[in-house]
């Protein structure tokens, strides 16, 4: 009942009409590989600094002949690199597998780890996988070599429909495994469908998102013929200089749970999806022309399902491609639905991550979602770049909208932080999500030693930090990444890090343990392991078959109070000790801890040598 009351209280701050908690989905983990950002933390650094990751097309993406499209874009590094052995794939098969499939495998593992879920523990469970994708560039590259160059791995390796299936197969999970193609809205539609799967009980846990890799130069040329790309490599969302979009690539996944399940499991949601909607505009316009009425409708439906009023939105992450045709339509729809519902003194803030990364195609929507999740976490709104003067076709003041032009504090005096995320496919499939910050985590009462319960609120004086990898290089890399995290996050709670490493990470054959009593000592010793060295407080090696040793210490090694510190600091030890006392004799606790009235019980043979 306490959990349900907490959810009702939190929901009451969002709307007056407090309804059942059905419909809220927690984002408990994220992973991404975007231009200039190999993960959510790196993405936030890019956004907070107001930087972009647009570059000239790398040499390997230019093709044998000079392409006609502008050379700019957002690109990933080393898309050809893949740890095939880690995922149980032979080198021969890996060469035939689309890098989009390979990237989703990596992102799936990282997203589960970010959620504190050991992948082995979901085997056989109802974990659903929903992945948006529409690019087939690798298949086209393979087809150039002709059928005689194909192997038995080529067909499944290049089938886009297998992107989600391969992750489900690797994890050995039995929930739905679905590929989504609704054009540029694919990844956000995948998240929408994933939420439905959770709400119907079809899945208990879901990994959802999208992927896009632009490996074929001709694909960009064809896109330029359809709707011109920005000639100067900048996305001018809502700006008077809007002249086309910038192609980008990447992948992003989120791990979703029903909110009540996430809170009951002790998860810390990064944000909450309050509601979502998907629609199409029919044939009222040309196939690839955006439909304002359809966009208005998808906004209203999402707000209705989230059970919020439009006035409660504080920010909207735009589709925002920077095209002369698309931006005015999106702005007009937002103004009609949201801007008109807000006080004129508080225009709606809007922005687009496409100004930082380019248009990530099938992964564009999930990029916006992860941006908003990070903004909620930091309680700051990053700037939407390249905005100086409003597009003359967009009357921002009349629409009651404002472009977020700098990194600003995001606070709400009258309730949770609430944002919208939009993503529209070129064929007319529109999707909108309503996102909120999560309810505060419940705090369990502190357990006191005198009552037979551990005090989990105090960290032990020395902490073990457990690391592992499939090989020595991977182990060193883990140590380096952990060290980087501790350097970048001076506020990180070390006992939480130690716990997560010990309890919420898969354990591999190459292992190391670093023992440290503080931040500086931890940094020093992680540096040693990262460099492949050894030293005080660092133990590393390769795991072998375990062996059992039974130690009989004899009489005389006991002392009064022995184990009290362990009992006070570690709830698991306390629970086991209490269980032993119940099975043997409750007086054991008094004897070991030297409690008042216990006298010299510990010197008695009955207790000293049972």
Summary of predicted features, one role per range:
Residues 2-455, 505:
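Condensing-enzyme catalytic core of the thiolase-fold
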Residues 30-33, 52, 290-305, 315, ...:
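Flexible catalytic loop/linker elements that gate and position reactive groups at enzyme active sites
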Residues 42, 333, 476-477, 524, ...:
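Short, solvent-exposed alpha-helical surface patches in well-structured domains
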Residues 46-47, 76, 223, 238, ...:
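A generic structural signal for nonpolar/aromatic side chains embedded in well-ordered alpha-helices
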Residues 57-63, 88-89, 121-123, 494-499, ...:
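Short coil/turn segments at secondary-structure boundaries
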Residues 64-66, 118-120, 145-149, 340-347, ...:
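Short, glycine- and charge-enriched coil/turn segments that flank and shape catalytic ligand pockets
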Residues 103, 107, 477, 481, ...:
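A non-catalytic, amphipathic alpha-helix used as a structural packing/dimerization or gating element
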Residues 469, 536-610:
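FabD-like malonyl-/acyl-CoA
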